[in-house]
Each structure stands twice: as C-alpha cells, then as structure tokens.
A protein has these predicted regions:
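NAD-dependent ADP-ribosyltransferases
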Residues: 1-156
Length: 156
C-alpha cells in the first residue's frame, strides 16, 4: 500500500490525526434499522441517498467504473466528501433509531486502510473516518472493512 494519504496529512501538519497501525480510541458506528433489515455490515460504504425533504447524503467513497469493475478511489485529502466510512469517539445521542457498535481502541488497522480524526472537540463527539489508502475494487474494500467488522461489539 502506498504512503500517499499519510504524506497528505504530514504535509498539512496534521499527522497526529492520521492512524494506520491501531485504532486510536474506542470508535462508534451507528446502524439504522433499514441497514439492519437489509443485512448490511456495520462498516460498509454507504452509496448515499436523498432523505425526504432533506438534502442528499453523498456516498461515503467515490466509486468509478473501470472495465466493468467498481473501483473505490483512495482518499487524498484531509477534508471534504467521499473520504471513507464515518465513525465517532462517542455515540451521538440525537440519532434516534440507531443501534450503536463499538470498535475497540488498539484494534489493528488493516494495511489498506487508515483512520483519520476529522475534529478535535472536548465537549462533543469527534468524527473519525475509515479511509481507503489507495484505489481498489469495491469488493476488496469491503474485505478490508470486514477485517474491522469482526472486532465490533454491540454497545449497551
């Protein structure tokens, strides 16, 4: 795997917010009842949707088609859209109807992924992103995410 995403964080002076060895703290991911009914993994690239009466929710990652294969684009920025899968360092209380899952601190991060810390608040949940380091087939991205999924536990 390349070090391109690491260099982006290093050049921006944000290397302290880039992790590719171990999960830096307990992270939480909410799963909606709809996602659960569909049997979707907890960590998966949401394709986006348009909630009734609200602006569209963009896809988690950019997916392009190359020779008939769906390819996830590797993250190359510290901010913006299509960076990866959202997680938080605490549950978000106003997200009703979600079941929360915890990814424990010190869980090894698969070699094709990085976790980035996108905010640094003391008084509210901080956003973290599970990002693809490089372009890869969508199916392979899910394999790497599944390596983290197996460490998730349902939070009480």
């Amino acid at each position: 795997m390349s070090e391109a995403l690491r260099r982006v964080y290093e050049e921006a002076g944000l290397l302290k917010y880039y992790f590719d060895k171990d999960v830096p703290c307990d992270l939480f991911r909410g799963q909606s009842a709809t996602e659960a009914k569909k049997g979707l993994p907890i960590l998966y690239p949401n394709p986006g949707f348009t909630p009734k009466g609200k602006p569209p929710r963009l896809p988690d990652v950019e997916i392009v088609e190359v020779n008939g294969k769906k390819i996830v684009k590797g993250c190359r920025t510290t901010r913006g859209d299509y960076r990866g899968i959202s997680t938080f360092d605490r549950k978000i209380p106003n997200l009703g109807g979600f079941t929360w899952y915890q990814l424990p601190k010190a869980t090894p991060i698969p070699e094709a992924l990085a976790i980035t810390q996108d905010s640094d608040y003391a008084d509210r949940p901080n956003h973290f992103t599970v990002a693809p380091k490089d372009d890869m087939p969508l199916e392979l991205f899910q394999v790497w995410l599944d390596a983290l999924n197996k460490h998730l536990t349902k939070d009480a």
